[in-house]
Amino acid sequence: MSSTWNNNIGFTVFGESHGPAIGVVMDNVPPGESINLDKIYQFMARRAPKQNKTSTQRKEKDMPQIMSGYFNGKTTGTPLCALIANTDQHSQDYSNLSRLARPGHADYTGALRYRGFNDVRGGGHFSGRLTAPLCFAGAVAGQILEKRGIYVGAHIAEIHGIKDKAFDPINTTKDMIREVREKEFPTIIDVQGNEMIKEIDKARKDKDSVGGIIECIAINVPAGIGSPIFDGLENSIAQLIFGIPAVKGLEFGAGFKVAEMTGSENNDEFYVNDKGHVVTKTNNHGGILGGIASGMPITLRVAFKPTPSIARPQATVDYSAMKNETLEVKGRHDPCVVPRAVPCVEAAVNIALLNHMLEYPNF
């Protein structure tokens, strides 16, 4: 099933944007792990719509109701299931979409895949709304990892060409990660964040949208976790990252810049530091070699396309009658999904790392 990620951690998301609820089931979560529900709510609140000009005006509390797998503040080891109610749907905004394909959306391809029976309201199962259960699962995984000293953080690296400072690929600390995490608009340099907000608001006023890039870092990941070929760390992270709607690109470490380098420029030279650990002088490899963690920070950048729902007239087709039409999308939509996607990227990386950590000796 395409909505199930089944590895050491089993992870299934279900529901549609305008159905009664969405949810998640996690299998093989270690028993006896203390989970702080307030921290889960805080994590999910970072993904929820903000009451400002940078996000949709759809208002969802995103309060998960845990149905199983959690008792007396701890995981039980049985399937961990959470439901999240949908409470603010405007389904009438989508009344004509059973036959008109929104450019940039999965309406047309979804109709082909599911023979026209797919729920198109709000994007249905393809909606960014499904990142709420992803964030629940990622918040659980993140708490388990942080108890082992592993911290994952992300920030908005770029919005429509306006760039933030990058994480230090060698010396980023958990305090630096927490500082960015606590910001309403998560950039390292606040001045750049303010410029990004202006750019998003400009797109909104122009009845348009913009995309951007999120940078993510994971620190204190033990050297040696992961696998070669098909089950590598990059593979697992990539599968989950591309489960986030609107993601169109992913790079690790120096990424596509390595194509412009020589071997002597790209290679990260090893040495033994003052703590007796094998480390590298640089981190072009992004903390992963051969699908296996090197012990250096894992770094990645994720590209998000502009929100496809824009209020401008666009050419499309009525695929029930096979004729050309013009569509002006109605509804409440983000002029830029990137700010709300920051915890989604963290969640995906948390789940992937926990999945591989379960193979680690003395977990």
PLM segments and residue spans:
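N-terminal, positively charged regions that mediate nucleic acid binding
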Residues: 1-58
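Internal helix-turn-beta structural module
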Residues: 10, 307-363
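A short glycine/serine-rich beta->alpha loop
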Residues: 10-15, 118-130, 223-227, 283-288, ...
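Glycine-rich anion/phosphate-binding loop at the beta-strand->alpha-helix junction
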Residues: 14-21, 207-324
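Alpha-helical support elements that line or immediately flank enzyme active sites
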Residues: 20-32, 128-151, 231-239, 296-307, ...
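Glycine-rich, N-terminal phosphate-binding loop and its surrounding beta-alpha-beta segment
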Residues: 44-103, 107-109
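Short acidic, glycine/tyrosine-flanked loop/strand segments centered on an H-E-D-like triad
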Residues: 98-124, 315-333
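Glycine-rich, mobile lid/loop segments that gate access to catalytic sites or pores
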Residues: 113-229
